[in-house]
């Protein structure tokens, strides 16, 4: 089974933490590859995999667009239509309903909560 990882973890810099040294792997957003780093053994963040295979399974380059789309705040856009939509709120860590105006905005919009959760959780 694939490891369940917060999809946004792949886009933060690795954090070594303050404790003892352990060899780990992190996903480098710039190179879209998994790289070795020395982890302190405590604290740190979720961009931290015990093996290169675990890192690769959690942070595939093809997930970049979807993950970055979910980081943007849902935008209503300048038009005046009344279209209830769902967007992912990365601060709350959940999908929220908002009113889309029908034009512009961004790609963080889904017709159902289920579609939003499937893309962004």
From Swiss-Prot:
The record marks 20-21, 80-81 as: Reactive bond. SMART domains: KU (SM00131). It is found in: Secreted. The keyword Repressor does not apply. The keyword Glycoprotein applies. One of its GO terms (molecular function) is serine-type endopeptidase inhibitor activity. Signal peptide: none annotated. Residues 10-59, 61-111 form the BPTI/Kunitz inhibitor domain. Disulfide bonds join 10-59, 19-42, 34-55, 70-120, 79-103, 95-116. Highly expressed in gut. Low-level expression in salivary gland and ovary. Not detected in fat body and hemocytes. It comes from the Eukaryota. Transmembrane segments: none annotated. One of its GO terms (biological process) is envenomation resulting in negative regulation of voltage-gated potassium channel activity in another organism. GO terms for cellular component: extracellular space. Keywords: Disulfide bond, Glycoprotein, Protease inhibitor, Repeat, Secreted, Serine protease inhibitor. SUPFAM superfamilies: BPTI-like (SSF57362). N-glycosylated. Gene3D superfamilies: Pancreatic trypsin inhibitor Kunitz domain (4.10.410.10). InterPro entries: Kunitz_BPTI, Kunitz_BPTI_sf, Prtase_inh_Kunz-CS, TFPI/VKTCI-like. Serine protease inhibitor. Inhibits bovine trypsin, bovine chymotrypsin, human plasmin, human plasma kallikrein and human neutrophil elastase, but not bovine thrombin, human factor Xa or porcine pancreatic kallikrein. Reduces cell viability and inhibits capillary tube formation in vitro probably by reducing bradykinin release. May play a role in blocking blood coagulation during the larvae fixation on cattle. This is Kunitz-type serine protease inhibitor A. It comes from Rhipicephalus microplus (Cattle tick). The lineage of its organism: Eukaryota, Metazoa, Ecdysozoa, Arthropoda, Chelicerata.
């Amino acid at each position: 089974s694939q490891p369940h990882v917060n999809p946004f973890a792949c886009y933060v810099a690795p954090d070594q933490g303050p404790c003892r040294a352990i060899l780990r792997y992190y996903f480098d957003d710039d190179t879209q590859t998994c790289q070795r780093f020395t982890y302190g053994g405590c604290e740190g963040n979720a961009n931290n995999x015990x093996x290169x295979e675990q890192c690769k399974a959690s942070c595939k380059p093809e997930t970049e667009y979807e993950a970055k789309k979910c980081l943007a705040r849902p935008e209503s856009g300048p038009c005046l239509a009344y279209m209830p939509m769902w967007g992912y709120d990365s601060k709350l860590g959940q999908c929220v309903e908002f009113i889309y105006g029908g034009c512009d905005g961004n790609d963080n919009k889904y017709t159902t909560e289920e579609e939003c959760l499937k893309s962004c959780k």
